Structures are given as structure tokens and as C-alpha cells.
């Protein structure tokens, strides 16, 4: 869908055309779900928040100004809902589900020469996922938008309502925290 087509759909949706909005919602449903899943760490919560995001966007579409992309606006709604949800449920520990929707779902399966390498690779994946989940919320949100949603620092800054410098700093700190958290594993991997 080209940007002009998307703008036309937004304008039609603003005029009350439900079908136009449904086309937009269908296009962005999965990226929004993946982001919300990374933030909430729970499929059911992510699915509920995705629905809530689409409903809120539908109700507010007339207020949307075409100053930013529909994608940026929709992700901003999703992030705000997720942050409110997380704050509300901060004291409740939901069971952790391991992430299986990585950025590149069609990644090639690596070829390992030994069972030890398979075990180490699986251990690394689990440790990486856990390390990402343990990042402070602001860093995890920024990291998820850029790494898993493929957004630029500028787009992430618009969604998060902060400066590009803040986004860059959060990415720097998130990478530093991940590297520190994974340091024992990285040393082990180099020894094999």
C-alpha cells in the first residue's frame, strides 16, 4: 500500500467509511500485536491491547492530523495503552511466555556441527529473551520499536514523545545492559 493510498484510506475513514479503516487496521494489526507482546510479555494481554488500540484509533480517527504517518499515530496509541496497562498491573507477575515472534521470522535456521552448539544456541536465545524482558520499561519499549518493529530513531521518538537524543541514549543503555547481562554466556560461547 503506497503512502498516497494510505492517506486516502485515512481520509475515507475520517469521513466514516468503516471499510477503509478496516483495511488500515488489518495492515497494522500484526506489527502492533508484536510490539504489545514484547511490552506485556503475554499473548492474551497483547491481543486485548491490540483490539483496544484499534478501537481507540477507530473512535479517534477524525482527530488524526496527517502530520505524521498513520503507523506512527497508531503505534503511539498502542504504546500509551501498554504503558498504562503495565503501570496498572505492575505488582501482578504474569507468567512469562518466551517470545517466538522475532523481527525476522523467516530467518535461516543455523547449522550446528555438534549437540553442544545446539544447546548453547538455545541457552543464548533464552538468556537474550529474558535479558530483553528485564530491561527497564522505557528501554525495552525503545529497543522493541527500533529492533523488532524496524522503526527509525525519529519514528520511535515521535511515538514515545521524546527527543531523538533520548531514543539514542536509551538504545545505547539497552545494548550496554544486554551486553553486560549476556557477558557470561558470550565468554562461554567463545570457548567452544
Please report, for each region that a protein language model flagged, where it lies by residue.
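C-terminal edge and immediately downstream basic/flexible tail or linker adjoining helix-turn-helix-like DNA-binding
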Residues: 1-3, 12, 94-100, 127, ...
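N-terminal module of bacterial RNA polymerase sigma factors
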Residues: 1-31, 116-117, 180, 184, ...
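Internal acidic/polar
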Residues: 3, 92-118
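Amphipathic alpha-helical segment used for protein-protein interaction
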Residues: 11, 15, 90, 111-144, ...
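Sigma70-family region 2
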Residues: 14-15, 41, 54-69, 88-90
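Short, charged helix-capping/linker segments at alpha-helix termini
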Residues: 14-23, 33-52, 164, 186-191
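Arg/Lys-rich amphipathic alpha helix in sigma70-family domain 2
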Residues: 62-65, 76-97, 173, 184
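DNA-recognition helix of helix-turn-helix
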Residues: 72, 83, 139, 145-148, ...
Amino acid at each position: 500500500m503506497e503512502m498516497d493510498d494510505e492517506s486516502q484510506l485515512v481520509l475515507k475513514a475520517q469521513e466514516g467509511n468503516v471499510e477503509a479503516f478496516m483495511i488500515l487496521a488489518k495492515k497494522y494489526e500484526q506489527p502492533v500485536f508484536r510490539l504489545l507482546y514484547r511490552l506485556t510479555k503475554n499473548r492474551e494481554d497483547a491481543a486485548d491491547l491490540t483490539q483496544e488500540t484499534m478501537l481507540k484509533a477507530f473512535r479517534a480517527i477524525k482527530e488524526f492530523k496527517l502530520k505524521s504517518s498513520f503507523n506512527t499515530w497508531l503505534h503511539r496509541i498502542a504504546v500509551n495503552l501498554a504503558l498504562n496497562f503495565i503501570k496498572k498491573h505492575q505488582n501482578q507477575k504474569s507468567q512469562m511466555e518466551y517470545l517466538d515472534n522475532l523481527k525476522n521470522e523467516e530467518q535461516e535456521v543455523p547449522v550446528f556441527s555438534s549437540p553442544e552448539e545446539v544447546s548453547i544456541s538455545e541457552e543464548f536465545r533464552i538468556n537474550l529473551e529474558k535479558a530483553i524482558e528485564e530491561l527497564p520499561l522505557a528501554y525495552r519499549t525503545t529497543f522493541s520499536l527500533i529492533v523488532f518493529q524496524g522503526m527509525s530513531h525519529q519514528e520511535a521518538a515521535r511515538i514515545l514523545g521524546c527527543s531523538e537524543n533520548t531514543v539514542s541514549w536509551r538504545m545505547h543503555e539497552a545494548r550496554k545492559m544486554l551486553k553486560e547481562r549476556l557477558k557470561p554466556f558470550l565468554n562461554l560461547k567463545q570457548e567452544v
